[in-house]
């Protein structure tokens, strides 16, 4: 589902409907969401009703409609809403669509004015985290979703647990903290302003907290 359940009244709160059926709930691991409508705060609503169930973010796309090749337009917003925003609302995993897509660049570096998708029978407006040049099937171009994944995976290791954070807050700062299985800590921070910010982690806790 999308966060707003596509505005279909009989689908609103769909996970709750399943979880409220004790027999059906036994066979459901959790709920999965896309971000093409609504607000990610719905993740917290679902978690609070069924904290024992998994939450997984399973799809978001970039393309011609949202400046998908322009990192200045998409990287920070993608990292905040997908990379950190979902995790801070109890998602245990995040995937994006699609990891790699073939694109006809017509000899040009991809931009919103060139290098348009060319996939008969497929999405004609979508870019992948990585675009593969169809002319040589070798040249690749990395987009915002690729760099979002790279930033996170550079410090957050498989099996890491998100830990609670508290202290000074700033409207221009978004962050999430983790403890890796080897005992090391990871701290992912987004600075949405054009000014430098000084942030000093001083202590750690295993308490999980949600986004506010």
Q: What would you call each of these model-derived segments?
A:
Residues 1-80:
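Noncatalytic carbohydrate-binding groove/subsite architecture in carbohydrate-active enzymes
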Residues 2-4, 35, 57-62, 95-99, ...:
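Active-site proximal loops enriched in glycine and acidic residues that flank catalytic Cys/His/Asp
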Residues 24-27, 86-91, 152:
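A structural motif corresponding to the C-terminal end of an alpha-helix
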Residues 31, 149, 187:
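Conserved, mostly hydrophobic/aromatic
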Residues 57-147:
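Aromatic/acidic polysaccharide-binding cleft in carbohydrate-active enzymes
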Residues 145-158:
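Acidic, glycine-rich loop-and-strand cores that form catalytic or ligand-binding grooves
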Residues 154-157, 165-204:
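Carbohydrate-binding surface patches
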Residues 205-212:
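Conserved small/polar residues in nucleotide/adenosyl-binding loops
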């Amino acid at each position: 589902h999308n966060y707003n359940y596509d505005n279909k009244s009989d689908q609103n709160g769909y996970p709750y409907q399943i979880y409220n059926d004790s027999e059906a709930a036994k066979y459901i691991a959790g709920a999965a969401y896309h971000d093409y409508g609504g607000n990610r705060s719905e993740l917290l609503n679902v978690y609070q009703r069924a904290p024992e169930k998994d939450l997984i973010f399973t799809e978001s796309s970039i393309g011609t409609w949202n400046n998908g090749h322009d990192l200045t337009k998409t990287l920070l917003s993608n990292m905040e809403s997908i990379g950190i925003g979902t995790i801070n609302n109890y998602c245990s995993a995040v995937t994006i669509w699609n990891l790699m897509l073939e694109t006809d660049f017509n000899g040009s570096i991809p931009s919103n004015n060139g290098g348009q998708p060319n996939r008969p029978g497929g999405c004609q407006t979508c870019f992948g985290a990585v675009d593969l040049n169809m002319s040589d099937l070798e040249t690749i171009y990395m987009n915002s979703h690729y760099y979002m994944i790279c930033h996170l995976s550079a410090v957050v290791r498989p099996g890491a647990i998100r830990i609670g954070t508290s202290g000074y807050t700033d409207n221009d700062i978004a962050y999430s903290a983790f403890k890796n299985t080897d005992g090391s800590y990871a701290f992912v921070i987004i600075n949405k302003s054009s000014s430098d910010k000084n942030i000093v982690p001083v202590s750690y806790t295993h308490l999980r907290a949600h986004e506010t």
